[in-house]
Regions:
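General small-molecule cofactor/ligand-binding pocket signal
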Residues: 6, 34-36
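Loop/turn-to-beta-strand initiation segments
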Residues: 2, 98-102
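Short glycine-rich anion-binding loops that position phosphate/pyrophosphate groups of nucleotides
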Residues: 11, 75-78, 106-109
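Conserved strand-to-helix beginnings and helix N-cap segments that scaffold or border functional pockets
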Residues: 17-20, 82-86, 115, 135
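S-adenosyl-L-methionine/SAH cofactor-binding core of RNA-modifying enzymes
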Residues: 32, 39-98
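Structured adenosyl-cofactor binding patch, chiefly the S-adenosyl-L-methionine
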Residues: 112-156
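Proline/glycine-rich low-complexity loops and linkers
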Residues: 105-106, 117
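N-terminal beta1-alpha1 ligand-phosphate binding loop
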Residues: 1-27
Length: 157
């Protein structure tokens, strides 16, 4: 089984890049994990929000493989405490055969076809975060889940 974080647009700020890469590497000690970047759309000034979401949606769908289990990071998704998320991840590790793909959409969210392609939605908070920051929050929580499942010293209850 492989874990993939699919994001729209590259991470820009250096301090986020450094921290994200650190947690990605730490997480790889436990699981097969990678982060794939879908390039940002260019020349979007003449596109409506809906058109932009549709175009991003087409690129997201092209990045998915048959058999992927798709989980959207979405403000309307299920919320977990860290231990609950770790338990959810553990269940997925026993039931997903190919890739578990977490997707962070563009600035306007997801096109309807992406919601249709997803099996689940999870929310990392009721608060709103930048798309740059949420990447770091997610990879930190995935790493935390791995340390919880492996009785590591990182997480404290």
């Amino acid at each position: 089984m492989k874990f993939t974080l699919l994001v729209v647009g590259r991470t820009i700020e250096k301090h986020y890049i450094t921290a994200i890469n650190d947690y990605v590497e730490r997480t790889r000690h436990f699981i097969s994990f990678d982060m794939e970047v879908i390039p940002e759309l260019k020349n979007t000034k003449n596109l409506s929000m809906e058109q932009q979401k549709e175009k991003e949606g087409e690129l997201i769908l092209k990045a998915l493989l048959p058999g992927d289990v798709v989980v959207l990071l979405d403000e309307h998704g299920k919320e977990f405490r860290s231990v609950e998320f770790a338990n959810w991840i553990e269940r997925k590790m026993h039931t997903v055969n190919k890739r578990l793909v977490f997707i962070i959409g563009g600035p306007y969210g997801f096109a309807p076809k992406i919601y249709d392609a997803a099996q689940e939605k999870i929310s990392l908070s009721k608060m709103t975060f930048s798309h740059q920051m949420i990447r770091l929050i997610f990879v930190e929580q995935l790493y935390r889940a791995m340390t919880i499942l492996n009785n590591g010293p990182y997480h404290h209850e």
